[in-house]
Swiss-Prot record:
One GO biological process term: glycyl-tRNA aminoacylation
GO terms, molecular function: ATP binding; glycine-tRNA ligase activity
Name of the molecule in the record: Glycine--tRNA ligase alpha subunit
Family the UniProt entry places it in: Belongs to the class-II aminoacyl-tRNA synthetase family.
Record EC number: 6.1.1.14
Name of the gene encoding the protein in the UniProt record: glyQ
Gene3D superfamilies hit by this protein: Bira Bifunctional Protein, Domain 2 (3.30.930.10), Class II aaRS and biotin synthetases, domain 2 (1.20.58.180)
Length: 293
């Protein structure tokens, strides 16, 4: 099964179980959790069920395309369901079956691994899912987002699309993944991986990036003051990505790192609080029956 087909199968599977299928959010981010479809919608009492592919950028993970299993740009398949179904593990195993993986024929383990994203004040309890010794999915029951309690608790499933497809295709390198029967993953992304790694570690301008962080922070704060939730979140995400670029460049000390993360987290909390306030003022309009089965 090629990479394109894996995505199509997961879209069909989760759509059939009541999930809204949305498109990737067009701001750089290090994880699908930071999309408003997850970060904001996990808050408050309104039900929500969504699935989407999210391109992720983690500048420090770049290896110029030389590491067969580690890229600084990759894809996650993100699922968020609120409230969490009681049988979510069984539903997940069914999703593997549609990809041709029969759980009874494989060593599938749920390994306890609590998750945290300190920059946006998000954390949860859950597991890594290991398939014959390789991690392919992260299960997280969200406890907080933006430093606010998640009530009810949402379940987030994050599939590692490259790892999952490598397993299905029995290949040993991301670049060798069959994308669509004609082109490989390397045909699509290898040159970009080389150039972006060069940018992340060598060609970026730290002085300019520090200035950009400050400007993005100012813009985020004034948007929050004007009670503009989504534009405010956009600029919080820009701050987060700019911080990651500075971190990859090695120009942020341990002390500075903690301070920068705290600044981002404080803005993320303000956005989350504002979102909840606005939804409450609207009377939480999505409070109606919605289920995933």
């Amino acid at each position: 099964m090629n990479f394109q087909s894996v995505i199509a199968k997961l879209h069909e599977f989760w759509s059939d179980r009541g999930c809204l299928i949305v498109q990737p959010y067009d701001i750089e981010k290090g994880a699908g959790t930071k999309s408003p479809h997850t970060f904001l919608r996990s808050l408050g009492p309104e039900p929500w069920a969504v699935a989407y592919v999210e391109p992720c950028r983690r500048p420090a993970d770049g290896r110029y395309g030389e590491n067969p299993n580690r890229y600084q740009y990759y894809y996650q398949y993100q699922v968020l369901v609120k409230p969490s179904p009681d049988d979510i593990q069984d539903i997940y195993l069914d999703s593997l079956r549609v990809l041709g993986i029969q759980p009874e024929d494989h060593d599938i383990r749920f390994v306890e691994d609590n998750w945290e994203d300190a920059a946006v004040g998000a954390w949860g309890v859950g597991w890594e899912v290991w398939l014959d010794g390789m991690e392919v999915t992260q299960f997280t029951y969200f406890q907080q987002c933006g430093g606010l309690d998640c009530r009810p608790v949402s379940i987030e499933l994050t599939y590692g699309l490259e790892r999952l497809t490598m397993y299905l295709q029995e290949t040993d390198a991301i670049a060798k993944i069959d994308w669509n029967g004609t082109l490989t993953y390397g045909d699509v992304h290898l040159q970009g991986e080389i150039e972006q790694s060069t940018y992340n570690f060598e060609a970026s301008n730290p002085e300019l990036l520090f200035q950009l962080f400050s400007l993005y922070e100012q813009e985020a704060l004034q948007l929050i003051e004007k009670q503009l939730v989504l534009p405010g979140l956009d600029y919080v995400l820009k701050c987060s990505h700019t911080f990651n670029l500075l971190d990859a460049r090695g120009v942020i000390s341990v002390t500075e790192r903690t301070r920068y993360i705290g600044r981002i987290r404080q803005m993320a909390r303000q956005v989350a609080q504002l979102y909840l306030q606005q939804r409450e003022e609207l009377g939480f309009p999505l409070l109606k029956t919605q289920s995933v089965s």
